[in-house]
Amino acid sequence: YDQPGLALLETFQYFIGNTDWSALAGPDGEQCCHNVVPYARTDGSLVGVPYDFDGAGLVNAPHALPDERLGLRTVRQRLYRGPCRSTEELQAALARFAAVRPQLTALFTDNPRLEARRKNAARSYVDEFFGVLDDPARVTSAFRRNCAP
C-alpha cells in the first residue's frame, strides 16, 4: 500500500467512527480485505478504497451494533484500528482533514435532504472529531492508545 494513502484511509475510518474494516486481512475464507478494496495505481502502488459504512458512528444506522470484541458500547464510540504511525505520518493525515474542516462540516449542515435531527447529530459527531484534532493530548490518546504495533 501507498503509506500516506493508507494513513489517510485509517484516519478517515476513525473520522466516521467505522471499526468494521481491514485493509490487510479478510474474513474467514478470504485473503484480503474487509470493507476495503485495494486498487493498483499506474505506478504499481496500492490505494485502499473503503466501502460499507452502515456500521459507522457518523451514519448511526438503527441496526448497527459494535463488535463486542472491541469493548465499545455503541457505534458512536470512535476507535482507531490502524497501526502505530510515526508522528509525521499521523500529522500529515490529520492535516488533510483540518484543511477541509469547513467543507466536511458543510456536507451535513448544508444538506437539504437531511432532517434537522440528523443534521445536528452529524454535526455534533464531526465536531467531536475536530475536538480531538484540536487537542494534542487527545490526538495521542485516540491514535496511540489502541494502535497496532
Describe each PLM feature range.
Residues 1-62:
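Conserved kinase catalytic-core segment
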Residues 64-66:
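Short secondary-structure boundary/capping segments
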Residues 70, 74-149:
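Middle-to-C-terminal accessory/interaction subdomains
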